[in-house]
């Protein structure tokens, strides 16, 4: 990382896997950001586990690559992995450097190796290079988390340009394909691939027409690839979050007027926080999940998947 930048101040973390996290209730700010958005500028601040997550050595010795690891669910997974004993490489868009620096510092604060890999995954060569660089820097790979995503709300199919549609497809479908394919020679018996799907795969919203299609594809990706790789002992699973307070939502993922009450219609009456999703990724990455493959784990605040 560049030496001329100030290192972030790290908060202390409390004991317990998830110890009384401060979960803000609606209404939230309706402030929007340009894509791709930064967690550090959100109001209220999401809880990625910076203070609330403490591990129990469930991933000791493992090496993980997390795409979209600078903010949101990817950030929470990266923090949790490090606190569970894993070395972690994170990929992020170059415009998210400031968020990424905080995550790198948090990983290193746990005494784990941290690798920063900025790249736009819509470019095939860049996506494949991220995998190669992670394997080289970490000395191998046991866990691949395909989490980076693009979500842009649109009132009508007529409002989605071909370029915008292509950007969503490239980010959410092509990039996981390229990266899983590139990682396969490095993944051995016991390895785990985790892809972030969404409740949108089961119950698509009208304003997320293109995003919902890709999340259904992500679910199918996990189910089909799990069958392919089962003979090699490599597990593949998906996670389907419901409404979670991340930079994805404030950078075009939701309309401005929907942000104050985002997630308030869930039975729990609020959106999820990224730290509340991270334990699913820890489980699926761990040896505890040795008989779990081809599954899609939902966390929707009680709304369910309807599937």
Residues covered by each model-derived region:
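Short, small/polar-rich loop/turn modules that mediate ligand/substrate recognition or access, typified
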Residues: 230, 235, 292-294
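Short C-terminal tail/terminal secondary-structure segment
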Residues: 5, 10-11, 42, 50-51, ...
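A glycine/serine/threonine-rich, flexible loop-to-helix segment
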Residues: 207-209, 231, 242-267, 306-307
